[in-house]
Amino acid sequence: YTLIEKDGKHRKGTLSELEGRFAFIDMLDKYNNVEAKKNARPERYVVKGFGLDFKQRLNSREKAYSKFLYYKNFYGNEQITILTEGKTDPVYLKCAIDSLFLDYPQLVREEKNTKNRVLKVNLFKTNDKKKYFLDLSGGAADYSRFFRRHGLLCKAYEKQPPKNPVIILLDNDTGPSDFINQIIKDYSHLPKKAEDVRKGAFYHLESNLYVLFTPLLPGDNYSSLEDFFEPKVLQMKYNGKSFDKSNNHDSSTTFGKDRFATYIVRENRKTIDFSLFKPILDSIIEIKKHFINLHPSK
C-alpha cells in the first residue's frame, strides 16, 4: 500500500491510513445499501447464521475489509491481542496491568513527561462492526468458530511470519465446556480429558494462537476473573446493593458485572490490590516468550 505525496514522491502507507480508506468505502457501502433497499435494511451490521464461512454474507469490498481487519488484529498485530468473553474483562485486565506496571514492563509503559501509562497489549473490544466483519461478539461459542478458521485465514498472510501472539482468555467455569471439548478433538497435542486441560497454565493451538484459562481455585474449583479480586472488593456496596456476578441476579438487591467494573473496579483502581491477577499476567508473559522461541526475529 503506497501513497503519493504532494511533491509526487511515493511512500509506504500505514495500517491506520489503509484502515481509514476501508472505513470510508464501507461508509459509502452502508449508505448505498440502505438507500437501494428503501430502508428495508436499516441496520447495516446484521449478522446471519453462516457458520464458519461467515464471509458468504459479505460483498467483494467487505471481504477485502474483513481480510484487512483480520490481519491487523490477529496476524500483523503490533501488540499481543487478548480476546476475552465479556466487556467487563478488559476493564479488569487494564486496571490490573496499570496497577502492577512496575512488575510488568513488558505489558505497559509509563510516559516520562505525563506519567500516563500506555498498555503494550491490545485488549480486543467487540462492537457491531467487528461482529459483522470478523464474526466476533465475545464468548466461548464465538471463539470455537474463531480457532477453527484461524489457521485457514492466516494462510493468506503466511509469506511473512505473525508478529505477536493472539490469546483467547476464558473463565475456567462451565461456559467454555464445548470450547474445551472442541480443542481436545482438533488438537492432538492437548490433554485428552477436559479436567486436565483446565489445569494447564496455557496452550499453544497453532501459528500464533493460544488459549489461557483463569487458574482453578483451591480444590480444583471453577473460577472466573472476578474471583481474583480480594473479598473486600467483592463485598463493596453500590447504591446500597451487593455485587452478584451471576447473569440472573436480582437487580432490586444486587448489581451485576457492568456496574462492578465501572463503579467498583475502575473508580477504585488506585487503591485496589490486584496482586491476585499476577498468575494470569505471568502466563501472558510466558506466552510471549513461547511465541518468540517459535518465531525468532530475523
Language-model-detected regions and their locations in the chain:
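Acidic, divalent-metal-binding catalytic cores of TOPRIM
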Residues: 1-298
